[in-house]
Amino acid sequence: MRKTFSCIIILLASFLCFAHRATAGIFRSDIVIAGGGTSGVTAAVQAARLGASVVVVEQTTWLGGMLTAAGVGAVDGNYNMPAGLWGEFRDSLAAHYGSLEALKTGWVSNVMFEPSVGNRIFHNMVAKEKGVTLWTESEVKAVNHNGNVWTIHVARPDGHTDTVEAKVLIDATELGDIAKMCGVPYDVGMESQAATHEDIAPAQANNIVQDLTYVAILKDYGRDMTMEKPEGYNANDFACCCINDKCITPKEPNRQWPKDKMVTYGKMPGGKYMINWPIEGNDFYANMVDMTPEQRNEAVRKAKAHTMRFVYFMQHELGFNTLALADDEYPTADRLPFMPYHRESRRIHGKVRFTLNHMTDPYGQAQPLYRTNIAVGDYPVDHHHTRYTGEEQLPDLHFHPVPSFGLPLGSLLPQEVKQLVVAEKSVSVSNIANGSTRLQPVVMQIGQAAGALAAIAVKQNKGVDEVSVREVQNVLLEAGGYLMPYADVPKDSICFKPCQRIGATGILKGRGVSIDWHNKTLFRPDTVVAWNDIAGLAEVYPFAAKLLRHGEEASSVETNGPSVDGQSVGEALSVDALSVGDALSLVSAIAKQEKLMKRSAAMKVMASLAKEYDFCIDDRQRKIKRGELAVLIDGVLHPFEKKQVDVEGRFVR
């Protein structure tokens, strides 16, 4: 009997933790992820860590997508915001190469690495999660949803088709192909100003996407490696890629670099060079989104040929004849990456659409989407269009400045299709916003959020659109993620989580700045709190509005202050800035009004919090700091957990 019971437990465990074959040719899994790219791999790891079984369907043999299989071994942005699995990946790179400093080999990024190393790290991350089944050299060919279960047909490398049944499907493909397969409406190209209300959007919509790049990884062989002149070669196509005698009329005269700087731009550890050069280099225009497979293959062939012509130009015209395609990077016949670097995809019509306006003025929008953030970024709006014929008629979107920003959960959810989560670059953002949200650290966080959302939905037997926004955010925060893009409250700060949670309620708001390449949002934890700083308190606790009005109107005249349930909030409210006494009175009054605890109990909790977070509340006249107030509000009132929000960021009353 004991042996039989043990067998049952083992079988049950295999059902819960792994994709398993239900009948001949049919597998079952909690979640299927189409695409093992930059967001697909993080979605798989996060979902598995929450106990879900996952099947990842990846067309190549590599994991990591644009970071690895496309050759972009240079991470753009988020160096000071190592959120979640992006932070784990960066730490793994540092461990491999010896230090974070060892990653600073090229000037385009502070995190440079060989794509093959990144691929091994991603495979190791996935291999540690027993709930993940990885199907490489495989492709989703058809999907069907009956209202409860997805049926997914997958072409396998030996020519046969396997069928997987899953509760949730995640589209982590490079171009949003699964979303289209599921009938999700989407946009391609630039929306009009009328559609997005972005002042730098074009007046008329168009279907122009960003240039893609077929990256080349070169290494120095120490001898002449000049290739044969490629078919269709014309030196004029690349003459102004850098400062040289052939350049007469550059498209971008303000972006001309010496030839050595062009090469060291993408210098990698291991003495290799990433050739992903946007200035009349190997960027290539092809709108592959709605092409047939045959048309895509032809576009890829042309993009590869364009890159090889550029490599020949570097060898033959610029004197870099000892550089050639690395023979120890890709296991491909032509030594090129598995796929092009796509900067733009389909963008679904989601529950919400994230635009430039949400980035530049998150607190001034009709939808307070900042309350629903699941990923953060700090890269400027970066669009590549110089290889498009007629690009001079397009908006100038080259490094348009923005503060750091957060991406909302609702951008991952289609408006209509149930139990589908969309990740990678196909989330519901505007074309302009995609110039920032497309970068690798953000996309890794998108994947992690998608995995968390899917796993929670499975665990709770809910629709993905029924899962609490706050629950997803809390999982991400506990996994080392960021909800708010604060530059001045690092992840190792003792008050990181309280500031993140209170920031996500809007009780205390950040201040965005963009200076040169430094795009930040500042929480200002060590700044004293002005009364108007906490205007957001009334949005969470409407009855508190009268308390705040009294505080703003307070003078140096002694007053007993307004009362709540007959009890005075404060003996003498401070002028302009809150004192410690004001804060204690305010928080304890709200705790009583919300029936969380008596005021005396609240005072004891705040004394304990002050000790835990190492600040003093004995001097009631001292001006309280923003970080300290965040700790008190978070620890006593718990507004993040107790005041739920919908996908538009509105409080659920």
Where are these regions (language model features)?
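Positively charged n-region of N-terminal signal peptides that target proteins for export
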Residues: 1-5
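N-terminal Rossmann-fold NAD(P) dinucleotide-binding loop
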Residues: 40
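Bacterial N-terminal signal peptides
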Residues: 7-17
